[in-house]
């Protein structure tokens, strides 16, 4: 089914609701280009749904410009900007028309996929011959500071609530269905000046077959960031598919956290066992899809998990529950915050075991179960294991208790010889302690080449000693008596 936002997007500035000053500024700007006068690029800044992109496309249509657009769904790194935008900024289109370049949501440029994108945009803007319109929700991001100096900034405010009902009536007329004026005003008041959101809400109610004021009142308020409590109220109270799925659209919580909130508050709202069982059944199915998302890294399954946990639980009840219900945060978050220190101790112990057993911490947990049994039954063996795994006394107390840990460390202390550390006595005046002469270290056998050198030196010394001896003790003269 085609989205009505695209189907009924204004084709001309005259069809755009409100923004009269902005429209006139755009007309003056584009006519300067048509007359050959180069102008600075324009940056349209405003909240989502205020009509920034619509204004850019409408002015292009009015003045017969071809549009080249890069939005948040496109890869917008340095190379892409240079190849696509850089080329289009200085040349005509294939049809011979002038080209209007639209860079949507430039404040969303971030991460590795868009690396160098902002710097390349600034480079392109300085040499652009064709008109360029940029849009942003938050123009005062630090990354856009240099960019702001190279553009003409035009602030686009939210659409006035009074300008929304005529647009909704026009769409209802073209789609061929009747709608109560109270429903239109309720949708407009819930939109918070977001025309796109108002059209989406109208389509949700119309396709769901329910155009009652009561259903329109359950639509989420978009005038500010919606809290998780608002989302809980909508999911638990509504029986409308589209309203339930849109309940978490403006909530700044991940699906895992939202799932915990629903799980915690479901028994508070659903008092009939059949409704409660149905709600948890859909919630468990959403958990399966969330697991597949992370396991397979296939984020296309994300929307199924979201639909099951919101619309699934909302439609599980047979009828709405009246009255006020006090919703609260998941108790698991409180427990996790309380046990943060304990969980960190367990991680440290598992890391030590994993290091010694050359396994992961996940497998080390299985090993730890057996170790605890040994710790509680055999202090002697436990002492050796504690020394091997280098566990501290505090860690042992955490795994067992103080008594068991004390017994094990007593065994460890008994195995090691105690070294008495006495304080040195004062020296007596009459007696002095003899200094202890350290023994000469044993010299190992010298290597073969060194042996030859040592032998040669020893022979030379021996020869010199012999000569010296002969000088001191000369030989006596030999006589015939020595032969007899």
From Swiss-Prot:
Provide the binding site for ATP: 46-53
- Give yes or no: UniProt keyword Protein transport: no
Task: Identify the Gene3D superfamilies for this entry.
Answer: 1.10.8.60, P-loop containing nucleotide triphosphate hydrolases
Protein's UniProt keywords contain Ribosomal protein: no
- For bias type Basic and acidic residues, the affected ranges are 419-432, 442-451, 459-478
Top-level taxon in the UniProt lineage? Archaea
Q: Which GO terms describe its biological process?
A: DNA replication
> Region entry Disordered: which residue ranges?
419-484
User: Which keywords does this chain's UniProt record carry?
Assistant: ATP-binding, DNA replication, Nucleotide-binding
Q: What GO terms are given for molecular function?
A: ATP binding; ATP hydrolysis activity; DNA clamp loader activity
Q: Which family does it belong to?
A: Belongs to the activator 1 small subunits family. RfcL subfamily.
Subunit structure comment from the entry: Heteromultimer composed of small subunits (RfcS) and large subunits (RfcL).
Role noted for this protein: Part of the RFC clamp loader complex which loads the PCNA sliding clamp onto DNA.
Task: Give the protein name, as stated in the record.
Answer: Replication factor C large subunit
- Gene encoding the protein: rfcL
């Amino acid at each position: 089914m085609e989205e009505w936002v695209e189907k009924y997007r204004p084709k001309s500035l005259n069809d755009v609701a409100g923004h009269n000053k902005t429209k006139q500024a755009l007309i003056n700007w584009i006519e300067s280009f048509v007359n050959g006068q180069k102008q600075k690029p324009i940056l349209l800044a405003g909240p989502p749904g205020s009509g920034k992109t619509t204004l850019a496309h409408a002015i292009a249509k009015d003045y017969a410009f071809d549009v080249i657009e890069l939005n948040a769904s496109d890869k917008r790194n340095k190379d892409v900007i240079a190849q696509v935008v850089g080329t289009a900024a200085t040349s005509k289109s294939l049809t011979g028309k002038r080209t209007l370049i639209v860079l949507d949501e430039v404040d969303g440029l971030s991460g590795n996929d868009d690396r160098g994108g902002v710097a390349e945009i600034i480079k392109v803007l300085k040499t652009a011959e064709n008109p360029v319109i940029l849009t942003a929700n938050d123009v005062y991001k630090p990354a856009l500071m240099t960019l702001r100096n190279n553009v003409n900034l035009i602030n686009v405010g939210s659409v006035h609530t009074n300008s929304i009902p005529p647009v909704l009536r026009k769409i209802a007329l073209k789609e061929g269905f009747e709608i109560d004026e109270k429903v239109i005003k309720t949708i407009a008041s819930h939109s918070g000046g977001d025309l796109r959101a108002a059209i989406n809400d109208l389509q949700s109610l119309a396709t769901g077959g329910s155009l009652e004021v009561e259903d329109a009142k359950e639509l989420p308020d978009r005038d500010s960031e919606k809290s998780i409590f608002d989302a809980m109220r909508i999911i638990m109270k509504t029986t409308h598919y589209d309203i339930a799925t849109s309940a978490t659209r403006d909530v700044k919580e991940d699906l895992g956290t939202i799932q915990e909130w629903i799980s915690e508050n479901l028994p508070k709202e659903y008092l009939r066992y059949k409704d409660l069982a149905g709600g948890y059944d859909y919630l468990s199915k959403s958990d399966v899809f969330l697991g597949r998302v992370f396991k397979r890294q296939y984020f296309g399954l994300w929307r199924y998990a979201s639909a099951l946990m919101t619309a699934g639980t909302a439609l599980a009840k047979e009828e709405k529950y009246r009255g006020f219900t006090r919703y609260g945060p998941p108790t698991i978050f409180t427990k996790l915050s309380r046990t943060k220190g304990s969980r960190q101790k367990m991680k440290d112990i598992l890391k030590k075991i994993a290091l010694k057993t050359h396994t992961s911490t996940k497998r080390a947990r299985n090993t730890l179960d057996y170790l605890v049994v040994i710790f509680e039954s055999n202090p002697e063996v436990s002492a050796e294991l504690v020394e091997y795994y280098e566990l501290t006394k505090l860690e042992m107390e955490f795994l067992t208790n103080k008594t068991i840990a004390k017994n094990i460390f007593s065994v460890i202390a008994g195995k090691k010889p105690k070294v008495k550390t006495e304080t040195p006595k004062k020296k007596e005046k009459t007696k002095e302690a003899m200094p202890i002469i350290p023994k000469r270290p044993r010299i190992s056998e010298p290597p073969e080449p060194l042996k030859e050198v040592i032998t040669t030196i020893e022979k030379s010394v021996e020869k010199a000693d012999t000569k010296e001896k002969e000088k001191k003790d000369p030989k006596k003269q030999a006589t015939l008596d020595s032969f007899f």
